[in-house]
């Protein structure tokens, strides 16, 4: 089992699929990485040689932000928006959608579960 960017690649998966287990790498990026390193994308991840693994690792470190670095950059970007007090930052702070979706009836994912209406007390 190859370990790249702190992630154990799954066994018996094609390399283009196995690389997508790394945060920040999708299918297109995985194919681009494999093409630049000269690794066959149909090859299984458990059939990689140590040289191929090292080439992929070097390519990732040199040209791509993945895993922790990417997560930190995303978090820092959201924090910056909240600090400068722009509209998107306020929406993030309040836990509401910030891309213009309606919130009257939808956006339950961002708002969380519904708060029920309290039953009126009988007098």
Curated annotation (Swiss-Prot):
GO terms for biological process: translation. Keywords: Ribonucleoprotein, Ribosomal protein, RNA-binding, rRNA-binding, tRNA-binding. Residues 97-123 are annotated as: Disordered. Transmembrane segments: none annotated. InterPro entries: Rbsml_uS13_C (IPR027437), Ribosomal_uS13 (IPR001892), Ribosomal_uS13-like_H2TH (IPR010979), Ribosomal_uS13_bac-type (IPR019980), Ribosomal_uS13_CS (IPR018269). GO terms for molecular function: rRNA binding; structural constituent of ribosome; tRNA binding. One of its GO terms (cellular component) is small ribosomal subunit. PANTHER family: 30S RIBOSOMAL PROTEIN S13/40S RIBOSOMAL PROTEIN S18, SMALL RIBOSOMAL SUBUNIT PROTEIN US13M. Part of the 30S ribosomal subunit. Forms a loose heterodimer with protein S19. Forms two bridges to the 50S subunit in the 70S ribosome. Located at the top of the head of the 30S subunit, it contacts several helices of the 16S rRNA. In the 70S ribosome it contacts the 23S rRNA (bridge B1a) and protein L5 of the 50S subunit (bridge B1b), connecting the 2 subunits; these bridges are implicated in subunit movement. Contacts the tRNAs in the A and P-sites. Belongs to the universal ribosomal protein uS13 family. NCBIfam families: uS13_bact (TIGR03631). This is Small ribosomal subunit protein uS13. It comes from Solidesulfovibrio magneticus (strain ATCC 700980 / DSM 13731 / RS-1).
